[in-house]
Amino acid sequence: MAAVWQQVLAVDARYNAYRTPTFPQFRTQYIRRRSQLLRENAKAGHPPALRRQYLRLRGQLLGQRYGPLSEPGSARAYSNSIVRSSRTTLDRMEDFEDDPRALGARGHRRSVSRGSYQLQAQMNRAVYEDRPPGSVVPTSAAEASRAMAGDTSLSENYAFAGMYHVFDQHVDEAVPRVRFANDDRHRLACCSLDGSISLCQLVPAPPTVLRVLRGHTRGVSDFAWSLSNDILVSTSLDATMRIWASEDGRCIREIPDPDGAELLCCTFQPVNNNLTVVGNAKHNVHVMNISTGKKVKGGSSKLTGRVLALSFDAPGRLLWAGDDRGSVFSFLFDMATGKLTKAKRLVVHEGSPVTSISARSWVSREARDPSLLINACLNKLLLYRVVDNEGTLQLKRSFPIEQSSHPVRSIFCPLMSFRQGACVVTGSEDMCVHFFDVERAAKAAVNKLQGHSAPVLDVSFNCDESLLASSDASGMVIVWRREQK
């Protein structure tokens, strides 16, 4: 049962940063061996109920040993070596639509995360205050964490030395998405409205375009790397999603949209990369099984407008979707069946398209609340607090940017939780990349990068924040190099 072994490995990976804090190579060896054993045992044919029981017990034991997780995202940033070992495969997983086991004993159960969102802040604070010495918690004394993040202020840390490289293979067509590979400093991909996706390598010099993925007949609106970087999923205005092998660039599978509509966004389910959520121009979100090419039964829901942005929380229990009418919907994701249950709706601003959503469980030491970063066409970047386990949002603060019509995106910085303050980065229609400190009450602007000649649509950091990539509406992709202190 491929789905269960991937979930077991995901649980191990989330706790891996707490193992042997001073010997990261042992953590890497451990998680690789776990991956190998789990793949082998997945073929043994054990009863599904036994596997699910093992998954529950494994989670309980790890929780007793290491305590509640503080921030899966920052644990990933701290221990990036675990990601490659969590290989995604296209082995056929259980088809949720046809498997009575998935719909029987567990079909009636509502998904419940380790701790509800309304208790997450208290849990995070308890973890911060009560952990034994030597544990991996972002504090001023966390030397290993500070070594990664740099023992500097935010302004000093996000000073950039200039352009490292400029990619112009998509010139004259907008590049709506640029993303570094997971746990990779030098591998980058970007998609273009010219219908192609570029895979780029930044080292060794000079940076090169390794291959261009072609097959879509219209513009590529979005793409996502799998956890292990061996697969990419792309969505297109040609009403199809495609599954690509990153190693050789071949198209593994083409999947038509269930509604025959333009596909506008996509995201992997973080625990089970066999499932991908897509949003389309007919106002629908669909959970797709990329192993079978089928829509998951119960995994569809309708929004009020064209679906432009998607984001899961780190455990994969909550999904947020934004549309072009200005609404953000939260959905409960059932891990057993892939079913979506609509939970909450927030109208950010009536008629203002929501173009980007990023979720984070722990922003910084000062902001230990689950948060959502949202771009809408309001000339503002919005930071929301997640206040309960159904994804209810409460506005925390906003930052001034220029965005009135373009699909601008933003990100949380991957290493933010290990230093004083916390930084977010966003594109803007003023052709600049903006950095903001979410904890600074006045003068939140930290830095501004100038060099684009068109609105900046997307930004992406590599895993150690040494490089930042930004893409614009004219097809230019700029890779910026951070100053070395």
UniProtKB/Swiss-Prot annotation:
Xref: SMART domains: WD40
Chain positions of WD repeats: 170-210, 215-254, 302-341, 406-446, 451-484
TM ranges: none
One Pfam entry name: WD40
Keywords carried by this UniProt record: Methylation, Nucleus, Phosphoprotein, Repeat, WD repeat
Entry keyword Nucleus: yes
GO molecular function, one term: promoter-specific chromatin binding
GO cellular component terms, A-Z: nucleus
Residues with Phosphoserine modification: S70, S74, S79
Annotated InterPro entries: WD40/YVTN_repeat-like_dom_sf (IPR015943), WD40_repeat_dom_sf (IPR036322), WD40_rpt (IPR001680), WD_repeat-ST_regulator (IPR051350)
Compartment(s): Nucleus
Residue numbers bearing the Omega-N-methylarginine modification: R114
Presence of keyword Metal-binding: no
Asymmetric dimethylarginine found at: R114
Protein name (Swiss-Prot/TrEMBL): WD repeat-containing protein 13
Organism the protein comes from: Pongo abelii (Sumatran orangutan)
Gene name tied to this protein: WDR13
